[in-house]
């Protein structure tokens, strides 16, 4: 069971003021320790648990680590994008651009909602000015770490399923249902039934 390996604490974010605000709100619980952030609307399916891959890199570098995915150029405007220098599957991040307009970056590597962060992120968030819609963006604090060469990106060997939309949630349910021996036949039968109607 999870309880044997981790302490899970729910922290209420008083208003939707951005991912940076959510991370900053958790500061009293993370204290002076490194911690992981996993966005629940992104499910990563692959041979190696994504957070484990990030922790292995963190153990070697001691710095902040972010999971990355390569997306089509037309999709970069929807994500935080990283630029930098590649060393194998690791990117020494030099620049972070939050949702760049099309054509403003050559990079197609975006954050996928998995991070290992140092406690230093909290004071960076505290001094970050809110952006659009009054939201505090984690990417602004990550950009500061990148400017200090203290952020590593890792190209994850995983498929990302975005459950943030109704169609994305349906796709994730189908992909996961079809991948399990105990549910695959039932999911196929459901698809066939609704496909015929």
Each model region followed by its residue ranges:
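Conserved beta-loop-beta/alpha segment of the NTase-like Rossmann-fold superfamily
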Residues: 1-86, 119, 125-128
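Catalytic-core segments of class I nucleotidyltransferases/pyrophosphorylases
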Residues: 36, 55-59, 86-189
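Intrinsic disorder at enzyme termini
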Residues: 187-197
